[in-house]
């Protein structure tokens, strides 16, 4: 059996995620998920044979809000998982510096030394 990455069952966002900054409300991922909510409202009108763009504007707004809210927590979880992965990677790099030699950094116009 494969061990799970997060041993705590049913934890969407651990308490450790509170230390991260919240995603910006103008994050393109959030705006895209809100747009998907709007499209789902249009598809709902299409399936129920209502006028697509004009019927149920309150319902479309509800879909946008619900998708945006769910997307906010999905983006927050994604940021948390990336932060955990980065912490593990940098911890490994700190413990094994011989595997990661520092390369010489030079500018475009400068001559390379060595």
From Swiss-Prot:
Quaternary structure and interacting proteins, as annotated: Complex I is composed of 45 different subunits.
InterPro entries assigned: NDUC2
Role this protein plays: Accessory subunit of the mitochondrial membrane respiratory chain NADH dehydrogenase (Complex I), that is believed not to be involved in catalysis. Complex I functions in the transfer of electrons from NADH to the respiratory chain. The immediate electron acceptor for the enzyme is believed to be ubiquinone.
Protein's name according to its UniProt entry: NADH dehydrogenase [ubiquinone] 1 subunit C2, isoform 2
Assigned GO CC terms: mitochondrial inner membrane; mitochondrion; respiratory chain complex I
Example GO BP: mitochondrial electron transport, NADH to ubiquinone
Locations listed in the record: Mitochondrion inner membrane
Domain of life where this protein originates: Eukaryota
Name of the gene: NDUFC2-KCTD14
Keyword terms: Electron transport, Membrane, Mitochondrion, Mitochondrion inner membrane, Respiratory chain, Transmembrane, Transmembrane helix, Transport
Membrane topology: Single-pass membrane protein
